[in-house]
Amino acid sequence: MALKAQNTISGKEGRLFLDGEEMAHIKTFEANVEKNKSEVNIMGRRMTGHKTTGANGTGTATFYKVTSKFVLLMMDYVKKGSDPYFTLQAVLDDQSSGRGTERVTLYDVNFDSAKIASLDVDSEALEEEVPFTFEDFDVPEKLSDTF
């Protein structure tokens, strides 16, 4: 069966949860896994081989600035050495697509940096971009594979 336009998934039909709390002020979210590879030179071959030796999880979340949560997390680390790890769950749920729901859970999420202050005379809504790393992930619910 062919792809139909209504089967595509709207990026607006999503939610993000931080330790079970919905982060309603999320604007964009992206998590990536990149494999770590070592080069392997092989006798008699001109092309370099590659062996996967591990993986690295990174991502970025952009929020509308409506809370001081990330500023306070960074301040707690700087002042007290407290560096918490979290669980994030991204949910895609575009009912009109007929594809079902996808849930991706990231474990041991640690935020890398936070904008501690921002002013912008031209901004209609201030935003804060928060890069992070994670150490494991799971897909407890996946989209349909068939049309």
From Swiss-Prot:
InterPro entries in UniProt: DUF2001, XkdM-like_sf
Which residues fall in a coiled-coil region?
A: none
Q: So which domain of life are we looking at?
A: Bacteria
Q: Family assignment? A: To B.subtilis YqbM.
What name is this protein filed under?
Answer: Phage-like element PBSX protein XkdM
Instruction: Identify the species of origin.
Output: Bacillus subtilis (strain 168)
Its gene? xkdM
